């Protein structure tokens, strides 16, 4: 009888602990408005399911190519965090009263990663390249609507459309400007440049190991200033389950997930 009482008291004691413990448990509130100091240096490793076909976005039809090329090249304009137009290579732009002409003012003092100056000549060259019938690109149609393009000086690029075109500015956010001095005598469809690009953005190509990874390193001549991360590495891991195992093992820092994995 004494033994049964001890068991009963024990069960009652632990039940009380459980009840009061749960009652005092308070959910931790997270403040997502907190701001933290930005750290500089190090590397970021992400996983990609496919290998880039090349690093010239206008002739690439895959997302892997564009994702990496976006870190190497700039466009005339870009979107800010509120999806408003923001300066990139162009510091300003104006639209004529008849809505047919756009004048872009190019920022002065810009350089390619190899030290050559970036000017309106490069913008004109890129427009001619994307509209060239010999360039195998699916993106030409938007730029073929331009009936006239001029470069009055090294820092001005003007385009005139046959008719007013509402998405005109949008199209100039996605066209990567390419260096004329490296591509003017090249066939863009087969050039070495597609695997050894020279751009103007935060990063430049360090090495490309086919089937394994593409490594970028900080471009000290970036037109947008110093990147916070020294190196970006994109590892090619076709299977998402393998990517997840690499993520849990801390061998990669980022991966894309599907809705099932999110749940």
Regions found by a protein language model. Give the residues of each.
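N-terminal lobe/hinge region of extracytoplasmic solute-binding protein
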Residues: 47-97, 128, 198-199
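Surface-exposed binding/hinge segments that line
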Residues: 141-183
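Gly/Pro-rich hinge or "lid" segments in bacterial periplasmic/extracellular proteins
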Residues: 80, 173-227, 231, 241
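Ligand-site clamp/hinge motif
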Residues: 220-263
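Aromatic- and charge-enriched surface segment that lines or borders ligand/interaction sites
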Residues: 91-136, 158, 243-248
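Bacterial signal peptide processing site
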Residues: 22-26
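Bacterial N-terminal signal peptides
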Residues: 10-19
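Short, well-ordered beta-strand elements
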Residues: 40-50, 91, 101-104, 123-126, ...
């Amino acid at each position: 009888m004494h033994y049964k009482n001890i068991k009963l008291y024990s069960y009652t004691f632990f039940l009380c602990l459980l009840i009061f413990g749960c009652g005092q448990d308070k959910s931790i509130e997270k403040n997502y408005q907190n701001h933290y100091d930005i750290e500089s240096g190090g590397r970021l490793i992400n996983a990609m399911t496919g290998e880039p076909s090349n690093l010239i976005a206008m002739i690439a039809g895959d997302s892997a190519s564009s994702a990496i090329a976006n870190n190497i090249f700039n466009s005339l304009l870009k979107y800010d965090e509120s999806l408003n137009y923001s300066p990139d290579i162009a510091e300003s732009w104006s639209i004529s009263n008849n809505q047919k002409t756009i004048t872009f003012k190019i920022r002065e003092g810009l350089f390619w990663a190899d030290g050559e100056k970036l000017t309106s000549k490069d913008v004109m060259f890129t427009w001619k390249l994307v509209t060239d019938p010999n360039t195998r690109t699916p993106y030409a149609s938007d730029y073929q609507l331009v009936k006239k393009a001029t470069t009055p000086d090294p820092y001005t690029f003007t385009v005139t459309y046959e008719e007013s075109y509402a998405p005109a500015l949008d199209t100039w956010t996605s066209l990567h400007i390419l260096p004329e001095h490296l591509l003017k005598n090249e066939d863009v469809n087969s050039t070495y440049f597609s695997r050894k690009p020279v751009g103007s953005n935060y990063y430049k190509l360090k090495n490309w190991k086919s089937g394994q990874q593409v490594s970028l390193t900080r471009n000290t001549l970036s037109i947008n200033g110093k990147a916070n991360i020294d190196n970006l590495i994109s590892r090619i891991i076709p299977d998402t389950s393998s990517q997840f195992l690499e993520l849990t093992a801390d061998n990669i820092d980022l991966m894309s997930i599907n809705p099932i994995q999110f749940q």
